[in-house]
Amino acid sequence: MFLRFCSAACIALLALALGGCALPSLEGRSHSQAIAATADTPLGQTARHLRQLAQAPESITAIVPLDSPQEAFAARHFLIQQATHSLDVQYYIWRADTSGLMLLGDLLAAADRGVRVRLLLDDGGTAGMDSLLHTLNTHPQIEVRL
């Protein structure tokens, strides 16, 4: 009797555990993919000009370390303001603090001027932002994914 109970309990626990491994349904979710980079935008033209100045071939990529939080914020703010076609923004931690709300305002302004905005956030860093993110996701030019 005890063995039968333990077997049934193990099977039930296994079924529950395996059920938790299933992915959510993609039904109703819109398909989305990145827009290919183009040199026709103001940022693309600037990048092409800088590449020519550096005499760097097209296959070379680079990064520019931003040493201070102020520099990093200013760079993000500037790039969002200059966007004309699309923005793909990915963050591990996004807080509803002053800088986070200012950047969300910049993203909303970009969407209002016709820029497609895709925001990918780690859900662990968005505590208390569900309502705000849901509202942003209702904008026709904004996709929020957690």
Q: What is each stretch, according to the model?
A:
Residues 1-146:
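N-terminal localization/anchoring segments of enzymes in phospholipid and broader phosphate metabolism
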